[in-house]
Amino acid sequence: MPPRKKRRQPSQKAPLLFHQQPLEGPKHSCASTQLPITHTRQVPSKPIDHSTITSWVSPDFDTAAGSLFPAYQKHQNRARHSSRKPTTSKFPHLTFESPQSSSSETLGIPLIRECPSESEKDVSRRPLVPVLSPQSCGNMSVQALQSLPYVFIPPDIQTPESSSVKEELIPQDQKENSLLSCTLHTGTPNSPEPGPVLVKDTPEDKYGIKVTWRRRQHLLAYLRERGKLSRSQFLVKS
């Protein structure tokens, strides 16, 4: 199909100008008539001192905006702006008086101490051992712990003394009685008594039979003997 011809938009006509106001007032009922202003009040004016009006402004911001951001001039040697150069910020950076403290210093307990930096290849070749587990810390030697990049430093906790002396003082009969009492207490708790049975289980020979005929077994047997009831009528559709 040939392309459609582009129609020129009709030029907007200028609004009609009325040299005289309507004699009967505004045509719309919702519009209110404007009364001439007759009562005017004269308020004493105070001259503005431009030297003191900006006295509270910081001197860093006294520079005019035009000097910082000159107006863009079109068609002015675009080849110069093709290669962008790193520009420095026109405003100074903010400086903080006190350095920010890390979260570990606020806690007061150094949990992890970083060892001297090592290459990533050496660290990746080593076997993965959970350093923070107490069993691995007990089995590993001091040199192996020092060779790892991160070492767990446990807090100062007093370990209890060995109870070998106390075990010698306890007789053998008392030990056996305590073991029997522990096994009795740690057994499975007594299960609560079952409540009343709300719905009985369906026997296997009645699976697939509709509830209506399951409750009327004598009627179901009578109709099946007479051949007046098909299987699709009393069996559940699967």
From Swiss-Prot:
Outcome of substituting S51A: Abolished phosphorylation by PLK1, leading to decreased interaction with POLQ
One Pfam family matching this protein: RHINO
GO process annotations (BP): cellular response to ionizing radiation; cellular response to UV; DNA damage checkpoint signaling; double-strand break repair via alternative nonhomologous end joining; positive regulation of G0 to G1 transition; protein localization to site of double-strand break; recombinational repair
Keyword Plastid (UniProt): no
Localization: Nucleus; Chromosome
Residue window of motif RAD1-binding motif: 55-61
Family matches, as InterPro entries: RHNO1
Protein name (record): RAD9, HUS1, RAD1-interacting nuclear orphan protein 1
Organism whose genome encodes this protein: Homo sapiens
Highest classification ranks of the organism: Eukaryota, Metazoa, Chordata, Craniata, Vertebrata
